[in-house]
Amino acid sequence: MKVLVTSAWPYVNSVPHLGNLIGSILSADVFARYARLKYGKENVLFVSGSDEHGTPIEIEAIKRKVNPKELTDQAHEYDKHLFLNVWKISFDNYTRTESETHKKFVREFLLKLTKYVKVSEDEIPFCEYDKLYLPDRFVKGTCPYCGFEDARGDQCDNCGKLLTPSLLVNPKCSICGKAPIFKKSKHWFFDLSEFNEKIRSWISSSNEMPDNVKSVALGWVSEGLKPRSITRDNKWGIPAPFIGAEDKSIYVWFEALLGYISAVIEYFEKKGEVEKWKEYWFSNDIKSYYFIGKDNIPFHVVILPAMLMASGEEYHLPDVIAATEYLLYEGQKFSKSRKIGVWIDEAPELMDVEYWRFVLIRLRPEEKDTNFTWRETVRIVNTELNDDIGNYVNRILSMLNRYYNGIVPEFRSDALDDNDKKTISLINEIPKIVGDLFEKGKLKAGTEEMLRFVRECNAYLNLKAPWDLYKAGKEVELNNTLYIGVNSVKTIAILLYPLMPSHAQEIYDMLNMGNIENEKWDIASKLSINYGHKIGKVKVLFKKLEPEFESKIKDKLEKIRKDIEKMRPTLLK
């Protein structure tokens, strides 16, 4: 089976914050690392890229009197460096919407939709002060559905409804704040109404789509799908391919969604295997995973599958769409202008990146909005990582050194007591329990099961008390306890790997087990470290955050923020 893992493409006009990271890219990376161990790295592909077209970039370029691509070149490379080199995101291909492969594919694909594309004149908001047609997101006003006063012209962040600028009450240009006029302009529309029942049936029949995703998407479908404009009056974008649309560009949402396909095409083009991309899009033996934020649900669960259906080709429709709710920062929404939150180029200066990876998965808002706090961060690092995982690993391996010079003792299956049998059963079962949750997009829930296993292992060790067995000369029982213990440490390393790859490798180094990336997920369920194996050097796995960490962190953040701001590319300052 081929496994395609994707994450929503970050828009390059700002550095992603922690909420953006956990909502898509980090979640996708954790799953991709799991999938490679489970299904083999040769069968898993993880792609994403920079979303770089549209009005925000165009306006910024006009202000600075530069070509938009100059700005996005810098921003793309900056984000790419952060993802790949700092946050250890294991993309197989992190590309961009300015890729020639992407632009070519998008234009060719949209021409396949002509049966469902209609041309009509539409009233488009135009700012007389800025002398600019305003795309949906550059018009703000009051949501007609929930009354939220800061709704965008494409979507209300409060109730999640998709909008058009003409629906807003008291619309304003988000650049200058003045009321726009509405001018007629010819545009090309994708008639979603043709797919209302097909999309409804597809969503309803899915056994793998999470309930929160189904609920949002079916709510939108039940209101009746309407034609959505494919084209915009922007200059900075992919030129529309339709006859008569030479002065138009393609709406960024339509082209960015197609990036999931073009990124796979580009990956295999670079490998000289130009037809192999089809194995990830046209075979029956595929499973695809999309990691997104909840505000992106309608685009991924309605517009993308409708486009794939409309193409007339047998594209594989999305399987698991794992959409997070919002991550709050100390009870507030992240805000760049008000400096509320932490951004992904700031966070590594405050704490080890892999601590961040673990903390963010532990706080992943899978079913409801979740509040990030520094207090909870300290608890997770000091209690779960250090006291639970790190302490257990150290105790088992240190005792193996102390009592057996680091050599795994002989195992006697005929001399097991009930506690031994229970712990072996846990080792046998836990990889499947965690894996099944991961495959439903429930990474936080899977991690909670891993921690439950660690706590059970700690309880087993305390109950068996190897130090007392050693003193009492109970060699067979001591042998079995540490044999089971060292194998449970291997299990913990494999379960931890998707979240903390370097620390998991450190455990494998202590076990003298080689490269964990070449391991198989299912080996975590087996007692595979055998009698006579010599472990490596034991060292401290984690370090606790200092008692004053929480009280000092905000001052530290303020100090580093100014220096980091200077290092950012022009577009991201």
UniProtKB/Swiss-Prot annotation:
Location of the protein in the cell: Cytoplasm
Cofactor, free-text remark: Binds 1 zinc ion per subunit.
InterPro entries tied to this protein: Anticodon_Met, Met-tRNA_ligase_1, Met-tRNA_synth, Methionyl/Leucyl_tRNA_Synth, MetRS_core, MetRS_Zn, Rossmann-like_a/b/a_fold, tRNAsynth_Ia_anticodon-bd
Residue numbers binding Zn(2+): C143, C146, C156, C159
GO MF annotation list: ATP binding; metal ion binding; methionine-tRNA ligase activity
Catalytic reaction annotation: tRNA(Met) + L-methionine + ATP = L-methionyl-tRNA(Met) + AMP + diphosphate
Cofactor dependence: Zn(2+)
EC number: 6.1.1.10
Coiled coil: none
A Pfam family recorded for this sequence: Anticodon_3
Signal peptide from the UniProt entry: none
Alphabetic keyword roster: Aminoacyl-tRNA synthetase, ATP-binding, Cytoplasm, Ligase, Metal-binding, Nucleotide-binding, Protein biosynthesis, Zinc
CDD domains given in the database record: Anticodon_Ia_Met, MetRS_core
Enzyme's top EC category: ligase
GO cellular component: aminoacyl-tRNA synthetase multienzyme complex; cytosol
Binding site for ATP: K336
Major subcellular site: cytoplasm
Chain location of the short sequence motif 'KMSKS' region per the record: 333-337
GO BP annotations, alphabetical order: methionyl-tRNA aminoacylation
Keyword Protein biosynthesis recorded: yes
Motif 'HIGH' region, chain ranges: 10-20
Similarity field: Belongs to the class-I aminoacyl-tRNA synthetase family. MetG type 1 subfamily.
Function summary: Is required not only for elongation of protein synthesis but also for the initiation of all mRNA translation through initiator tRNA(fMet) aminoacylation.
HAMAP family with a match to the protein in the record: Met_tRNA_synth_type1
Protein name per UniProt: Methionine--tRNA ligase
Species for this entry: Saccharolobus islandicus (strain M.14.25 / Kamchatka #1) (Sulfolobus islandicus)
Gene: metG
